[in-house]
Swiss-Prot record:
Organism: Desulforapulum autotrophicum (strain ATCC 43914 / DSM 3382 / VKM B-1955 / HRM2)
Role noted for this protein: Binds directly to 23S rRNA. The L1 stalk is quite mobile in the ribosome, and is involved in E site tRNA release. Protein L1 is also a translational repressor protein, it controls the translation of the L11 operon by binding to its mRNA.
PROSITE patterns: RIBOSOMAL_L1 (PS01199)
Annotated GO CC locations: large ribosomal subunit
The protein's name in its UniProt record: Large ribosomal subunit protein uL1
Protein encoded by which gene: rplA
Length: 230
């Protein structure tokens, strides 16, 4: 177990670890536990009653957070011709030309998300070994392999996130910044939870939402009662 500092320990004492809070209470407690000087990211971790080893219990999707993430999202687009222009007009930061592709092969990752038109997947596929492990591989299921590059760029810039359940049945995503305040964070959290509920696999038996925990980058976790999602 990692050893936490004095301030973390002090803040942890203010949170009842056995309690389960509603959305507003949980976010207010989490924000009150922030003790660092930088604008921390607020994260949410949801443990689901699924076994992702089975394909029919995989939970994966995207959601547009109503208030974004509070940070600039750098977007790289694999496109050519008119689609390249559309991507740039929509706000894309980089176009993957030959020089950029070579930089990626050499270890450059100055972008947060990647989009590709279907006709460029031959080029993208050659970068699979470097993009895949970093979660940067364009994927049709998350809307990042598409000819509608303008829409894809705009959505990512606005705070659209993609997620998938991990081996332990947990989905972990950022939902904003401490500076957002409780109201905007609650809106983002609810949008994410509602999407998780909508994606419940038919084969999932028993309790689906097992635990929901919210925390700041450096702060302790605060549990949300799943009953408040109904």
């Amino acid at each position: 177990m990692p050893k936490h500092g004095k301030k973390y320990t002090e803040m942890s004492k203010k949170i009842d670890k056995q309690a389960r809070y509603d959305f507003n209470e949980a976010l207010e407690l989490s924000l009150a536990s922030s003790y660092v000087k930088f604008d921390e990211t607020v994260d949410i971790a949801v443990r689901l009653g699924v076994d992702p080893r089975h394909a029919d219990q995989m939970v994966r999707g995207t959601v547009a957070l109503p208030n974004g993430l509070g940070k600039e999202v750098k977007v790289l687009v694999f496109a050519k011709g008119e689609k390249e222009k559309e991507a740039l007009d929509a706000g894309a930061d980089f176009i993957a030309d030959e020089e950029t592709v070579a930089k990626i092969k050499d270890g450059w990752f100055g972008f947060d998300k990647a989009i590709a038109t279907p006709d460029m997947m031959g080029t993208v596929g050659k970068l699979g070994r470097v993009l895949g492990p970093r979660g940067l591989m364009p994927n049709a299921k998350t809307g990042t392999v598409t000819f509608d590059v303008a829409k894809a760029v705009e959505e990512l810039k606005a705070g659209k996130i993609d997620f998938r359940v991990e081996k332990a049945g947990i989905i972990h995503v950022p939902v904003g910044k401490v500076s957002f305040g409780p109201e905007k964070l609650v809106e983002n959290v609810k949008a994410f939870i509602n999407m998780i509920i909508a994606l419940k696999p038919a084969s999932s038996k028993g309790t689906y939402l097992k635990t929901i925990t919210v925390s700041t980058t450096m702060g302790p976790g605060v549990k949300i009662d799943p009953m408040f999602t109904k």
